[in-house]
Amino acid sequence: MNSNVAQTAGGARTQAVLAAVLLAGFLSVPVWADKGVIFLASVALVQIVFALSFNTVFGLAGMVSFGHAAYFAIGAYACGLLLRGADVSIFTGLAAGGLAGGALAAAIGWVALRRASGNYFAILTLAFAEMLHILIAKTPWFGREDGLTGIKRPAIDVPGLRPIDLAQGDGIFYFTLAAAALLVLGAWVLWYSGFGRCLAAVRQEPDRAAFLGIDVHRARLTAFTLSGVGAGFAGALYAPLAQLLTPEVAQWHFSALPILFCLLGGTSIFWGPVAGVLVFLGLEHSTRNIIGLSEVVIGATLLLVVLVFPGGLAGGAVRLRQMARRKRGPSTAMASTQGRQA
């Protein structure tokens, strides 16, 4: 029992150190980077939130969704329309994006989970996402194929202080960082909560979970809805950052991004998708100037990771750490025995 408590405490300390290092790294970006890299770091923060929201259903609940771009897109357009056409705060836009993503996910999940499962469920989510993509592309209100432009970055009013102007300097980057940090914290709490353990049980043994009294359908629908809320928040963060939204954010290839992030970084560990986002975007940025090379490098990296580390980069790191501990174990025990004999 004491050993388990020590391992849990050690894991919590490791995660706290990792989170602090990531936060410090992002905070340092405006100090040394140009505007292009700062924008890339902002996009990485948005994609981290998107990937973690997707991994709630993929890695935690064991469901595959090919249409998660729908919730990102509806959140982005809900926030973008409000910021463009109404005098509202950016927090109202974010809340609208999260609610829109959650509402759409709840509606699609309610239909899809009742009608299909496994591969058929994944295809059904893709079909709904493509329907939304067509709707956005054909609706004048959303800007059709030309996209939604004129999205403002309203200043944040702070009582007793001067307003924080998100349209000047690196204000939008720091706002995105603060919002993403809070959303990542929320995802972390969900992952390690009692409901998170319930979803893990549903993923591993749904029949046994049902026998123990867990409402499997309700648990999956709740997870799917919460995942949609997270994806909607990610889209809402993206709208004022990009200030331009096109129907491509609802296309199938945008739904493939969080899947690639999770497979690359690992689905069984909370920080796996974060590692996947950073490696993916880092490779894409470093090879962007050579036509066709980016896809080759990313594809080869993903193939190598899947073959060498089936659990992703984060899973591979944990596996290597466990192997190192096992190797140190016998030598440490022998040294301890020799010390007692002396």
Question: Which role fits each region the language model picked out?
Answer:
Residues N2-A342:
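Transmembrane alpha-helices and adjacent helix-loop boundaries
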